Amino acid sequence: MKKESVGVVETKHYNLSEELILDGGDSLKDVTIAYETYGTLNKQKSNAILVCHALSGNAHVAGWHEGDRKPGWWDNIIGPGKCLDTDRYFIICSNVLGGCQGSTGPSSLNPETGKQYALEFPIITIKDMVKAQKKLIDHLQIKQLFSVVGGSMGGMQVLQWCVSYPDMVRSAIPIATTSYSSPQQIAFNEVGRRAIISDPHWNEGNYYEGEFPDSGLALARMIGHITYLSNESMYEKFGRRLQDKEEYSFDFSTDFEVESYLHYQGDTFTKRFDANSYLYISKAIDYFDLTENGTVSLSEALKNVKARVLVISVDSDWLYTPAESKEIVMAMTANEVDVSYCQIKSSYGHDAFLLEAGQLSYIINGFFSETLVVDVMTIHAATITEDSSIEEAAELMLDEKVTHLPVVSEDYRMLGIVTAWDISKAVALKYDKLDQIMTRDVVTALPQDPIELAARKMRKHNISSLPVVNDQGNVLGLITTDHISTLIAGDKY
């Protein structure tokens, strides 16, 4: 399959209609969420993948904006025929709350003052970012995400989604991340913040009408960027080579290529990022701790996770180490979560999750190819009780636009199924009760059945729908031939 770009794209904006209550007790009014989408949401709204970005990222994850010289930050894995295939999936990425690329943050106008929030913006957490994303997903009328994917701080958001909204996440892929920020990670973030705060132009955060604290922000970026690389990658990229000179300068000017590279990274960063946003987002990273500062175990924190999870680490990542990823896997395994683990082999360090598109695509494609019934089924499917009338069943089918209704007991135990064909037969024969027409010997699927098994059952019995039940026979949802054809054929409609 030919791999292509999604082409020219535009950033959209969603304005929350209600206040957003924050983790720390404050609230925000008139919150705006900037987001981009790629691909088409199918009619079941079951093919949506939410991509979560890292500290310095934004909603522009793929394609090109008019006049851009570079594509979106994960364009190498998102697009037609790529790993996150936009011919098959509907990809969503939003700028995080507290950001500076279209979503409400400290550089946004405070509706109560008409001026930038600056330090009047409340402290936020990863949980707040995810809460804002959930508002967006609700706005898009998506009841359950096919997957949530993200690296670094994006991986923290993935884990928070699994914890905060377990019923909304079918699969999750946290990459190069951690379940809580370590003292070393907090230390690096604090040095970066001090670099910004120490800049005389920072002015207690009130710099928007004057000169910006670019020197401090550039230094913060330089410090952070070092943690994204590995010693091996720096040797490969720079060694001890001098920058545009044959010998040492014997002064404090730039001598080495690696110095010049860091200066470039810092300077370019100031042209696209807000210093106050850096303060707020890095603090949110520091506060991230699923164990709630050690008051619960990680296993306890992850006990309600329902998603199928793929944890990915990078062998040369010393910012968020493989050991931290394995700790997540162990905690999920203790809760019998369907979790798998893969490690990217790379010399790039933490940034490998952005650069190793080949390995990442191979791993993720393998994970998605093992699609289960739970990954695509309709949850909260319409059901009806045995004592209902034929007329009630017909009205429910029309209202819900379905052709199959599982018949259940008061505790949602599967009793049978009635179809549109059964209703037609009932009208012809003048039946008035469901128990006169419903099928009691029903072919069903389990949520953990491979999708191929469900498809074989439908072909064998010449049926177009299977109720999905748990081990106790309770109805959990419904899977149809439309779900399967959309998944296999990449049918967007």
From Swiss-Prot:
Associated pathway: Amino-acid biosynthesis; L-methionine biosynthesis via de novo pathway; O-acetyl-L-homoserine from L-homoserine: step 1/1
UniProt KW keywords: Acyltransferase, Amino-acid biosynthesis, CBS domain, Cytoplasm, Methionine biosynthesis, Repeat, Transferase
Annotated catalytic residues: S152, D317, H350
GO terms under biological process: homoserine metabolic process; methionine biosynthetic process
The keyword Protein transport belongs to this UniProt entry's keyword annotation: no
Predominant location category: cytoplasm
Domain CBS: 377-434, 438-493
Annotated GO MF terms: homoserine O-acetyltransferase activity
PROSITE patterns: CBS
EC number, as in UniProt: 2.3.1.31
SMART domains attached to this UniProt entry: CBS (SM00116)
Keyword Cell inner membrane recorded: no
Catalytic activity field: L-homoserine + acetyl-CoA = O-acetyl-L-homoserine + CoA
Limits of the AB hydrolase-1 domain: 47-356
Pfam families: Abhydrolase_1, CBS
Subcellular localization: Cytoplasm
Segments passing through the bilayer: none
CC terms in the record's Gene Ontology section: cytoplasm
Binding site for substrate: R221, D351
Record PANTHER family: HOMOSERINE O-ACETYLTRANSFERASE
Summary of subunit composition and partner proteins: Homodimer.
NCBIfam families listed in its UniProt record: homoserO_Ac_trn (TIGR01392), PRK00175.1 (NF001209)
Family membership noted in the UniProt record: Belongs to the AB hydrolase superfamily. MetX family.
Task of the protein: Transfers an acetyl group from acetyl-CoA to L-homoserine, forming acetyl-L-homoserine.
Protein name listed in UniProt: Homoserine O-acetyltransferase
Native source species: Methanobacterium formicicum (strain DSM 3637 / PP1)
Gene: metXA
